[in-house]
Amino acid sequence: FFTDRVRDTLGIDYTRSNILEIESGPNCGQLTGRMVDQPWGDICDGAEKRKMLLETCAQLGIAPSKAIAMGDGANDLPMMGVAGLSVAYHAKPAVRAQAMVAINAGGLDRLLEVVR
């Protein structure tokens, strides 16, 4: 949901993120915290994230230097290391130290300030 919003606002070709389950409630949907079935399973380690970034770039015919990778944990660092722009999002100190940009406050829409 969140990455789709950023994608649509910026006209980005492709985004990929975990998909969380939403349960219907009396007023609106609520996130359950459970993942919807995803081809990569519930756990996506650093090697898988890096592989998917490289495969996605190849499918789109772009260099990884044109990709943006955003993460918060050590398992995101391999993916962030091959992207042209690495963004630490409310990340652990080690990730913030290695990222090109750190977003420490606010929502995902803060990325718009970086890429516009």
Residue ranges and their predicted role:
Residues 1-116:
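C-terminal cap/substrate-recognition subdomain and adjoining C-terminal extension
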